[in-house]
Amino acid sequence: MWSSWAWTWSWSGAAAVAVAAAAAWVAVYAAAARAAEALWWRPRRVERHFAAQGVRGPGYRFFVGSSIELVRLMVDAASRPMEPPTSHDILPRVLPFYHHWRKLYGPMHLIWFGRTPRLVVSEPELIREVLLTRADHFDRYEAHPMICQFEGYGLSNLHGERWARRRRVLTPAFHTENLRMIAPFVAGTVTRMLDELAERARAGGAGEAEVDVAEWFQRVPQEAITFAAFGRRNYDDGAAVFRLQDELAGYATEAHSKVYIPGYRFLPTRKNRRVWQLDREIRSHLAKFVTGLQSCSSSHGDDADDGGDGGGGMREFMSFMAPAMTAGEIIEESKNFFFAGKETLSNLLTWTTVALAMHPEWQERARREVVAVCGRGDLPTKDHLPKLKTLGMILNETLRLYPPAVAMIRTAKEDVELGGCVVPAGTEVMIPIMAVHHDAAAWGDDAAEFNPARFAADDDGGRRRHPMAFMPFGGGARVCIGQNMALMEAKVALAVVLRRFEFRLSPAYVHAPRVLMILSPQFGAPVIFRPLTSAAA
C-alpha cells in the first residue's frame, strides 16, 4: 500500500515538474520571441520599408541602433573648437551626425535611437506638414522619464486632452500685459548685478572686469523669478529650487544621453536614491510657493498683498493657475517654469552678448537705439520695449544661429504619408531646427554669418522666406508658450547692460557651442566689461 502511494506521488510530482518546466520553457521562448521581434525583426522590416521608398541611413545595429556611431561623431566634434574662432557656422560641431549623414543620405534619412526609428526631416514644407497640416497624426514624443521628473509633468510633457486643457489654463497668463509685470524684477536684478560689476571694475585698477557670462547671466532669471515668486521672506526657498534643479539637471543630462532601459529608474541605486531625494526637496520648497499662490488667488487679485516682502509680481502673474489646478499640478508646472525660464533666458543673453562682442558695430547700433528710446537714466519700461527694433533684430538673429533647442521630435500616432513617403506608426520624426536655421536655400549665401538686418521689417527676403524656416521656440500648436516672456526679459536685460557697459570677448574665450540639454558654450563665455562714461553712454 505504502509503495503504491509513494509510486503514485512520485509519478504525480514528476509530471508536475515536467509541466512546470515545459511552461517555463514556453515562457522563455515567448519572451525571447518578443525580444527578437522588438530588437531585430521589426527594425529590419522598418528599414526595408523605408529603403523601398528611397529613404536610407546608417544601418540598424542590434539593440543600439545608430547610437554608437552617433556618439562617436558627437565626441569627435566636441574635441575641437570652432575654426575660425569667431565662426557662426556651428552646425557641423553641434549636430555632426546630421551634417555627416545628410551628405551621405540626403535631407530625409533614417537613423536609429536604440530600436526606435527616427526619420530626419529638414525641408520646411515637410516640417509644415508635421507641425501644422498633418499635426493630428503626430504627437510629442515620450521624453526620458528622468527628463520628465526633472522638467515636471506639466505642459511640455502632457498629451492629448490633458495637454489641451492645461494650455487653455496657462495661455492667458502669457498675454503681453501680464508679462510686463515681470519686467521690473528683471531690470532691478540686472541693475544690482551691474552695480557689483562696476565696483569690480573700479577695484581692479584697469577700469574693467571679466566675467563668465554663461554663469553670470543665470543670476538674471534666477534672482528675478525667486524674488518675484517668493519675496524676501522666502527667498531662500526659491534659491534652493534652482540649486537643487542644477544638480538634478546633471543626472537628467546623463540619462538623456543613454538608451532608456524600462524600470531602471526604480532600482535603489546610489544615483537613483539621490534623484529621489532631490525631487522631494524641490517639491517641498515649491509647496511653499503654491501656498502663497493660493493665498494670492483667494485674495481676489487687486486686494492681494505681498506682506511687504517685495514679492507678489510672479504670484500675481501665476495666480490664475490656483482655481483651475491642484496643488500637485501647480508644483509640476512650476518645475518646468523655473527651469525653462532660467535656461532659456540665460542662454539667450549669453549667446547675444557673445555675438555682440564679436560684432561691435551691431553692439554700438543697439546701444544708440537704447539711449535714444530709453534715455540715459531711466530703466526700460513696457512702453519702451516695442520701440527697440534693432535689439529685436539682434535677438532674432542670435536665436537663428544659436537656437536654445537644436532639434525637436514628434511621433507618428498612426501610419501617415509625409512627402510621398509612408511613415509607419511609432516612427519618430526628428526636425533639426539648427539645420533649417543655417540652410542657405532659406537664408541666402550668408546663412552662416551674423546679419540682424535680415530681420528688418523692410527686408524682401523675409517676406519670401518659408514660415517654417525660423522656429527657435518650436512650431505648431505646441510652440513654446513662454517665447514672448523670454524675448521681453532679454530686451530688458540687454537694454540695461548696453546703456552702462561696452564689452568684448576675453582672450581666454574659446568658441565651442555644444548641446547638453540646450545649446551652451562648452568652455564658458568669458567677456570683458568696461563701464561707459555718462558722456559716451
UniProtKB/Swiss-Prot annotation:
Keyword Membrane: yes
Expressed in which tissues: Exclusively expressed in roots.
Binding site for heme: C480
Keywords tagged on the record: Heme, Iron, Membrane, Metal-binding, Monooxygenase, Oxidoreductase, Transmembrane, Transmembrane helix
Species of the source: Oryza sativa subsp. japonica (Rice)
Cofactor: heme
UniProt record similarity statement: Belongs to the cytochrome P450 family.
Subcellular location: Membrane
GO MF annotation list: heme binding; iron ion binding; monooxygenase activity; oxidoreductase activity, acting on paired donors, with incorporation or reduction of molecular oxygen
Membrane topology designation: Single-pass membrane protein
Pfam entry (one): p450
Broad enzyme group: oxidoreductase
Gene that specifies this protein: CYP734A5
GO biological process, one term: brassinosteroid metabolic process
Name of the protein described by the UniProt record: Cytochrome P450 734A5
Induction of its expression: By brassinolide and dark treatment.
CDD domains linked: CYP734
EC number assigned by the record: 1.14.-.-
Protein task: Cytochrome P450 probably involved in brassinosteroids (BRs) inactivation and regulation of BRs homeostasis.
